[in-house]
Amino acid sequence: MLTQWNTRAQNRKFVASYSGGKDSSLALYQAMQIGEPVVLIVMLEEQGLKSRSHGMSLDIIHAQAKAIGLPIYSASATWQDYQSQFIQLLQKTQALGAETLVTGDIDLMAHTEWNQSVCDKSELSLCMPLWQRPRSDIVHEFIQLGFQSIIVTVNLNLGMTVEDLGQVLSLEYVNELVARGIDPCGEAGEFHTTVIDGPIFKHPLSVVKGDILYHENYAFLPLELEQRDI
């Protein structure tokens, strides 16, 4: 099952669940080496102004997709109707010939079971290129491939601080996180990233940093596109 989950995009057209962060970007890159991407799926919050997973603005999301060279299928959803909306998008991708869903999940079985369930209901196979790889290997490969990402969300209750916002994910910074007892991939929700360049991008995104926002135990750094990218 492990091997199948890693390689099910082999010689297939696939749809990628895309958050705009490091894990989904690396998974997309890996799948593109063996299969053919047809569309990105991005789930939005109820108002349809930001991504559901990372709180990323629509401008950034569309700029990422343009730089990658792929269209986006998106839907606004509450957590209550998230699954049904996601399945509808997956079913829509079949008209493009999609056979497989690619996700950036690493080792959380609950996420995998959910992914497999929506794939079964959509008659797609599931591909998780990063599945059960060592987390340090994943983030090191991400950086060494030339991806550039910025820390945009931190959980202040899990060892992260406001000073971490805006940090570029580098090998030196990852080592610092590990020394602080923080998972290098942020798999416990310690942090989220926004990818602004990498081998899947035809050109980098030029962004400016907004004012830090707070909500409960989270701090957020909004990113906006410079005028030339709009």
Question: What do the predicted segments below correspond to?
Answer:
Residues M1-I230:
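Nucleotide-activated chemistry modules centered on ATP-dependent adenylation/adenylyltransferase
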